Amino acid sequence: MENERCLDLKYAKLSKAGEIIEMLCICLGVFLIPLFLPKLLTIVFGKTSVIASNSQYVVGSVVNTLLIIAGVNAKGWKKVLGIVTLPSISALFGGLVLKASSVYTMYMIPAIWIGNFAIIYLYRYLFVKKNLNYIVTSAIAIITKCAAIYAGFNLLVLVNIVPNGSKVFTSLNIAMGMNQLVTATIGAVIAFGIIITMKSKKVSE
């Protein structure tokens, strides 16, 4: 019975100290990963490697994993707000994830915040509170996040902040569209593995 319901349960019940440590780790992760992971991948694999040249997919996948874990196990909306805002702030200051298009990140920040909040909120509300199946929750949360961010991008195009047909448009169209869908999906898969692992560990104890 436990295995049958493992998709509908939180992965762990932490002590107060454990919750604080978990949230600190997540906050540090979502801030530092966009800032330093691309450079690390370049050093380790080389600038022209497939992994380093597509570092935004690696960064986005890890950040989405942390956002989902926060949605499943975080307590208190004040903590969540920090987790929602830190990745885009890190990307803005580092100028790493979107590279040449990073100057436009500041215009996308509100949409990214809304998207990040949506994925955390929906996992918390649907998966944790309503016990909805993880896969269904993931589909709803990922689509909502991607729609919010891509809508923000299209608004910038509509008001001509991002010129339609330009190189910046092409870059951001991918970064705020397909990139978001791919990285959120990968993040959901990784988070699922973490949740199941922690749940299995809890059951065995």
Residue spans for each PLM region:
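Loop-helix junctions at membrane interfaces
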Residues: M1-E205
